Amino acid sequence: VKFLAITLVAHRPDPVTGERTSTHQRFREVLDSARLAEELGFDGFGVGERHERPFISSSPAVVLSHVAAVTRRIRLFTAVTTLSLLDPVRAYEDYATLDHLSDGRLDLIIGKGNGAAQRDLFHVTPEDQWARNAESYDVFRRLWRQDRVTAATRFRPPLQDAEVWPRPFQRPIRVWHGSATSKDSADLAARHGDPLFSANVTHPIEPYAELVRHYRERWEHYGHDPARVAVGAGTAGLHVAPTSQEALAAYRPVFEANRAFAEQTGLPVVFETLEDFAERSSALIGSPQQVIDKVHRYHDRFGHTVLHVQADAGGLTASRHRASLELFQAQVAPVLRRDIPDPPFAWEPVLPFPAPTQETTRV
């Protein structure tokens, strides 16, 4: 199993202390988190994309380019990049450039994105967002794989024998499809033979397990080898401590503050108590053995081989968050790496693709 640390780069007051860092300092924290993730042995570091408050992750390609410059080994992920909002040509140019700057360490997780404010900002409607996502990915995928592309498009000017530069370092690149609430993303991933990444954050396991089950069914429907299927899954929070009592005591102020924030902003409160949250959500809060057992329970339902945890302290003190990550890597990760297989593909950077030939593939 592989482990990612991800951030959506939320920028709001600390849920416990109420203190708020500057925008500049928040970005420096992201870079510090990436360095720490590599230092502790995480396999990937992800940056989300949001275009509405309280997030400042509107340019993940730019942030990940800086992360690439301050790291050497760890793979870099978009978590997710919102192709339904973007021109696929510009998205391709940005990520092909990042692919080179990172020496081929880039993985993409794509999705339609969440939030009415960012849909309004880009003039995307709930009715057309899925069609936009599918079309943008189709064009993006062709641009990455082919030297010239012709495509009749609905949501951007059509392409006619188009060349787009730079050509990528990895060819093809691995693209995951983020899945939170809809079978559309699961079906799109299965259709193209791409891996699925379940958000697995807001609710108990059942709706996410149903989407993963649907993805596996559609994977076989489209004729792909069941042995090549790959699933990733997120977590709603992380705090590992020597004992469950210590973990719950440290996390309780975080949970209470987050629940109060949800109530104030009109968000649904799914878990009323910390104990219920620790038991029925995907959050990994407890002793090392409790965390190991919980990941196994989720693996029994998902069959996932990649797991993401939160890179941000999120209300914990910096020292307590680091201690949690260190304990996770020292006592949790080795056991899970032994028990759960790796994804069915190489994780390391691949060799550059040979130079383009004069032959052109038409679409």
Short names for language-model regions:
Residues K2-Q25, L85-A151, P195-F197, T202-P207:
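Flexible, glycine-rich active-site loops centered on histidine and acidic residues
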Residues F3-A5, F45-V47, L76-A79, L106-I110, ...:
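Hydrophobic faces of well-ordered beta-strands that scaffold small-molecule active sites
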Residues P13-F27, T81-V89, R171-T181, E279-P288:
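Active-site mouth loops of central-metabolism enzymes
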Residues A5, V9, E127-V164, I205-T305, ...:
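An alpha-helical appendage that flanks or caps ligand/catalytic pockets
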Residues V1-T71, R75, R171-I173, A346-P352, ...:
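N-terminal beta1-alpha1-beta2 module of alpha/beta enzyme domains
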Residues F3, A37, G41, E49, ...:
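Conserved, mostly hydrophobic/aromatic
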Residues P54-T78, R132, S136, E326-I340:
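Alpha-helix-loop-beta-strand connector modules within alpha/beta enzyme cores
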Residues G44-V67, T82, N114, N200-H203, ...:
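Glycine-rich, proline-tolerant flexible connector loops at the mouths of alpha/beta enzymes
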